Design a protein with these regions (language model features):
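Zn-dependent metallo-beta-lactamase
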Residues: 2-5, 17-55
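Bacterial N-terminal signal peptides
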Residues: 9-16
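Divalent metal-coordination and catalytic microenvironments
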Residues: 52, 83, 135
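Conserved small/polar residues in nucleotide/adenosyl-binding loops
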Residues: 141-146
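Portal/gating segments that form or line small-molecule/metal binding sites
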Residues: 94, 99, 103-139
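Active-site metal-binding motif and surrounding structural segment of the metallo-beta-lactamase
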Residues: 65-110
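Hydrophobic alpha-helical segments, chiefly the membrane-spanning helices
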Residues: 152-154
Length: 154
């Protein structure tokens, strides 16, 4: 009888644990209709980390590994890093989102951290890294012209 109870307990525990699945994280999103009628979806992860998806294109801004499991998300066409603070630049998140075709746009300091394989901008610069996107680097309160920190205005 003692072995029967132990056996039943083991089966019940196995069934209970096997029924637990890891639920995928959900994040707030907002979908907008652009002037040309296409849908643009913005997903907010946390702090300054967000994603923009439109017409199958994926743009990530300030991805930080603590805020999302970027390896499970669609790969990036473009990654924008606004400046080199720890809560805006995470090389592991950039690597998780990148492919050989991914373009990373950032300031000079962030580019050095990422190994220099980026398009760099400083306040006042404009750049069109893709035919569907134009970026203007603006000097904001977290910016310091001497350090070439930027904020990206889409």
């Amino acid at each position: 009888m003692k072995h029967s109870k132990l056996f039943i307990f083991a089966i019940m525990t196995t069934l209970a644990v096997s029924g637990c699945k890891h639920q995928a994280a959900t994040y707030p999103t907002d979908t907008l209709t652009t002037k040309n009628g296409s849908q643009l979806t913005i997903t907010f992860f946390k702090h300054a980390s967000l994603a923009i998806e439109t017409e199958g294109r994926h743009i990530y801004i300030d991805p930080i590994s603590q805020y999302a499991d970027y390896a499970s998300l669609p790969k990036a066409d473009l990654i924008l890093i606004t400046h080199s603070h720890y809560d805006h630049l995470d090389s592991a998140a950039v690597a998780a989102l990148s492919t050989a075709a991914t373009t990373v746009v950032c300031d000079r300091t962030s580019s050095e951290t990422l190994g220099g394989k980026c398009l760099t901008m400083k306040p006042g610069d404009t750049l069109a890294p893709r035919d569907y996107l134009s970026i203007e680097a603006c000097l904001l309160y977290t910016s310091d012209a001497a350090n070439d920190r930027i904020s990206v205005d889409l």
